[in-house]
Regions:
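Membrane-embedded helical hairpins/re-entrant loop segments and their flanking transmembrane helices
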Residues: 26-44, 212-282
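Helix-loop-helix hairpins and the membrane-proximal interhelical loops
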Residues: 1-32, 163-243, 369-372, 401-415
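Membrane-embedded alpha-helical modules
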Residues: 74-184, 289, 294-403
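Interfacial segments of multi-pass membrane proteins
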Residues: 66-72, 151, 270-285, 291-295
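N-terminal signal-anchor module of multipass membrane proteins
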Residues: 1-53, 60-72
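Hydrophobic alpha-helical segments within and immediately flanking transmembrane helices
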Residues: 34-42, 56-70, 116, 165, ...
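Re-entrant/interfacial helical elements at transmembrane boundaries that shape
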Residues: 19-24, 53-67, 223-232, 264-276, ...
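Short, non-helical or kinked segments that cap or interrupt transmembrane helices
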Residues: 27-32, 49-61, 105-114, 159-164, ...
Length: 415
């Protein structure tokens, strides 16, 4: 019972974003939720069930899905085909990483790079939370204040339930003020429903539009896995391995493409729930996945979740996204890396590019590395690439030392 209640908190955290992507692109929200649940179970199978992560609809694919949809007269089946190919590219990348070894990848992601990337993920999400809260700041503040108060003064299991209790408080107040759409209760729709699954179609045009996005979301995946590992206190890049987490993401995305949903990706919102509750049991996320699958088939429950006011979710999201930023800054501080001026430059560069390009992008000014006419590496992905290269240049002496050590080990093995 305890784990089931905790899983509902993760369900609340992922619901808004997972439903928003299909609403923006035209996919069926019920199918998207179903795919999120199936994708999460696939991911946990691939990662030996040790990574407490939840997969939901990816925002990175929105512009290219819309472009593919427009190119095929509104037929999203071709976008599904492109999503499947993107997942296959993910699988190839997973195999390459397994071949060359994670150690050669890991040295390019020291604390000054990883910490700054994590902080950028959280800080870029906070404006979205504030926009949601702006629907009714009073209710948002009450919801946020309730979560903070329970987190500070709560004890034991009650403290772990701070998110779901805060949402309940915000929901009840909104209900009393008449701010909740209760039409789902009187709807004549049947209690159970089968999601409207749809088979994919393939075209070269849709594939060329969508597939290159994996180059951008690969960096986001590393950031998400590093954030998750930092919160839990484990190195998931090393064990179960980046190749396994990528494979899980790839197969989840392929499954979504075949079922008729948007591409899947690991969710920072659920990592923030882990940070707040301090409960890192991966089985709770698997229960959340099962709940999501059931939710996709129960129209009334889905209606209830969709009736939660935007401002209530905005208030909670402020706390969730702030926690992600805190984890990033804590990673930088704990490593003592900023005692080196070169590392300060790296941290600031990543944060300026990551936040600056996202801000300008919202103003219609796109700065980044163009991959295709519709795909540009910008925001976090661009910041990560620049940060990795800058770290390689400024700290090149450390790389030389590591190379000498590797050569010494190789020579000793030959002898």
């Amino acid at each position: 019972m305890k784990k089931t209640i905790l899983s509902l908190q993760h369900l609340l955290a992922m619901f808004g974003a997972t439903v928003l992507v299909p609403i923006l692109t035209g996919f069926d929200p019920s199918v998207a939720i179903f795919c999120a649940g199936i994708g999460t179970l696939i991911f946990h199978t691939c990662t030996k069930g040790v990574v407490p992560a939840f997969l939901g609809s990816s925002f990175a694919f929105i512009p290219v899905i819309l472009a593919a949809k427009e190119a095929h007269n509104g037929d999203l089946a071709y976008a599904q085909g492109g999503i499947i190919v993107a997942g296959l590219i993910y699988l190839v990348m997973s195999a390459i990483i397994k071949k060359i070894g994670v150690d050669k990848i890991k040295k390019y992601f020291p604390a000054q790079v990883v910490g700054a990337m994590i902080a950028v993920i959280g800080l870029n999400l906070i404006p979205t939370a504030l926009d949601m809260a702006s629907h009714n700041f009073i209710i948002a503040v009450i919801t946020l204040g309730s979560a903070v108060a329970i987190n500070v003064f709560g004890k034991g299991f009650v403290k772990q339930l701070n998110i779901i209790i805060a949402v309940a408080i915000g929901y009840i107040i909104s209900l009393m003020l008449g701010n909740v759409d209760t039409s789902f209760m009187s709807s004549s729709a049947s209690f159970l429903q089968i999601p409207a699954f749809r088979l994919p179609k393939f075209s070269l045009e849709a594939t060329v539009l969508i597939a290159p996005v994996v180059l951008a979301v690969f960096m986001e995946h590393i950031g998400d896995m590093t954030t998750n590992g930092t919160v839990v206190g484990k190195n998931f890049i090393e064990e179960p391995g980046l190749h396994r987490t990528l494979m899980g993401d790839a197969l989840a995305t392929i499954a979504a493409g075949f079922l008729g949903g948007p591409a899947n990706t690991t969710y920072g919102e659920n990592t923030a729930v882990l940070a707040i509750t301090k409960n890192y049991d991966p089985s709770i996320l698997r229960r959340t996945a099962i709940c999501a699958i059931l939710l996709a088939c129960v129209s009334k429950f889905g209606g209830f979740l969709q009736s939660i006011p935007t401002e209530v979710m905005g208030g909670i999201s402020i706390m969730l996204f702030s926690m992600i930023s805190y984890v990033g800054l804590k990673t930088i501080n704990d490593s003592k890396c900023i005692s080196n001026k070169k590392n300060i430059i790296i941290v600031l560069t990543i944060m300026i590019i990551g936040l600056g390009t996202t801000y300008l992008g919202n103003k219609g000014i796109v700065i980044g590395i163009p991959i295709t006419k519709t795909v540009t590496i910008t925001g976090l992905s661009l910041a990560a690439i620049v940060g990795i290269i800058l770290n390689r240049v400024l700290n090149r002496n450390e790389f030389k030392v590591e190379k000498k050590e590797e050569q010494s080990v190789l020579n000793s093995q030959l002898v």
